[in-house]
């Protein structure tokens, strides 16, 4: 298993990546549903049975007396409605038709009431269009966040896979180094045994070599155990069987990272900027909504249609009566001891505080990116130094082993 396979294939096929893909698809579907909510919606209503048999208390219109009347009837209703949201004004337009059939069993009489055509429109007098535009901006920003968040989550999964892979690589290098040292020490122990027989070293020196050999054996066993555990963690995360080996890649790392270029791409691809934009838009929407509630406003509703009543279905659609209605409702705050003004000031303060928090968070985020860049540059320098020191230590150990075998140590 190579590093390229782990990052570009196996990590993307893991269960964690599949879960993120499903969540991302849900976010896309939610945004698609929001856009489709502005398309015409066709609704069919059908109520075949509404049966009632009971005694009802009614008041006579002539003398005002009360009497109980038996109600034994079934009411059937059928209707269609087409609804359309108007994004420019924030209102809603409805067009439809209804028919109602009443069967009175006690009187053995049937009747039809129809509404062949009706159209209605309702909206706020002021502010509905702006609220809808703010809502559109918020939903578009949420969709952009969903795309960038998915890419960010996948990158985090790849980062986790990379961390586990490098941990396994480090354990493998430790185990290989432990094997080399153990083999070299076994050779030294054999040479020390020969020198002990020849009287070149004391038994104390030989025991020291034997103790060192046991310590190296202990280190070797731990290194093998850690390597097996790290491999198991890596393969478990990737969701593959533990029957493969990993290869040590050739590290070709850039010595430094351009901070300005990195910050540019982070702002472009990281979802944090869009998340702050959403928060700002929501605070702006909340401020505007509170202003609407605490100032002069109202609602308007316009209705026009045709209705008729008859004992036969054909007559119920003849000579329809025109039905019109206009409803205008005003909300006029007169005097509330300054409560409305204070509510607006509270919302304005929350809006300003949100803007300051966003600026502070973006500044801290840029500093965090710069710190990571500095950490990377410093780590690369340490890695180059450690690589050279490791190569020199191996050469020194080989030279020391050779000197010991020649009796110069």
Name each model feature, range by range.
Residues 19-34, 153, 157-178, 189, ...:
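Amphipathic alpha-helical coiled-coil segments
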Residues 1-75, 126, 131-134, 140, ...:
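Bacterial Sec-pathway N-terminal export signals of envelope proteins
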Residues 39-40, 44, 48, 293-307, ...:
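Exposed, low-structure sequence patches enriched in small/polar residues
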């Amino acid at each position: 298993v190579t590093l390229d396979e782990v990052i570009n294939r196996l990590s993307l096929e893991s269960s964690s990546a599949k879960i993120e893909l499903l969540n991302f698809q849900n976010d896309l579907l939610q945004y698609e549903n929001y856009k489709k909510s502005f398309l015409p919606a066709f609704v069919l209503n059908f109520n075949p049975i509404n049966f009632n048999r009971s005694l009802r208390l009614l008041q006579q219109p002539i003398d005002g007396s009360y009497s109980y009347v038996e109600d034994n009837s079934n009411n059937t209703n059928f209707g269609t409605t087409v609804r359309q949201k108007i994004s420019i004004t924030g209102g809603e337009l409805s067009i439809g038709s209804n028919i109602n059939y009443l069967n009175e069993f006690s009187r053995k009489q049937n009747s039809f009431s129809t509404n062949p055509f009706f159209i209605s429109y309702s909206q706020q007098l002021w502010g509905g269009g702006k609220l809808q535009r703010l809502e559109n901006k918020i939903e578009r920003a949420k969709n952009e966040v969903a795309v960038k968040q998915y890419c960010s989550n996948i990158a985090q999964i790849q980062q986790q896979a990379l961390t586990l892979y490098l941990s396994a690589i480090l354990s493998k290098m430790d185990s290989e180094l432990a094997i080399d040292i153990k083999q070299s020490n076994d050779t030294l122990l054999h040479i020390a045994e020969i020198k002990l027989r020849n009287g070149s070293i004391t038994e104390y020196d030989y025991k020291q070599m034997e103790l060192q050999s046991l310590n190296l054996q202990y280190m070797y066993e731990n290194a093998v155990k850690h390597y097996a555990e790290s491999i198991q963690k890596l393969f478990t995360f990737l969701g593959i069987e533990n029957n493969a080996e990993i290869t040590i890649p050739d590290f070709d790392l850039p010595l430094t990272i351009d901070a300005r270029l990195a910050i540019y791409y982070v702002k472009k691809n990281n979802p944090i900027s869009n998340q702050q934009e959403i928060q700002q838009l929501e605070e702006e929407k909340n401020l505007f909504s509170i202003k609407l509630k605490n100032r002069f406003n109202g609602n308007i509703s316009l209705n026009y249609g045709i209705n008729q009543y008859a004992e036969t279905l054909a007559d119920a659609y003849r000579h329809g009566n025109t039905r019109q209605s206009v409803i205008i409702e005003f909300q006029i705050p007169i005097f509330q001891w300054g409560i409305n003004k204070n509510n607006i000031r509270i919302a304005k303060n929350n809006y300003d505080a949100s803007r300051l928090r966003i600026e502070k968070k973006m500044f801290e985020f840029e500093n965090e990116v710069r710190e990571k860049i500095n950490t990377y540059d410093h780590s690369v320098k340490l890695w180059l130094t450690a690589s050279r020191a490791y190569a020199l230590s191996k050469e020194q150990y080989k030279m020391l082993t050779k000197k010991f075998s020649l009796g110069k140590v």
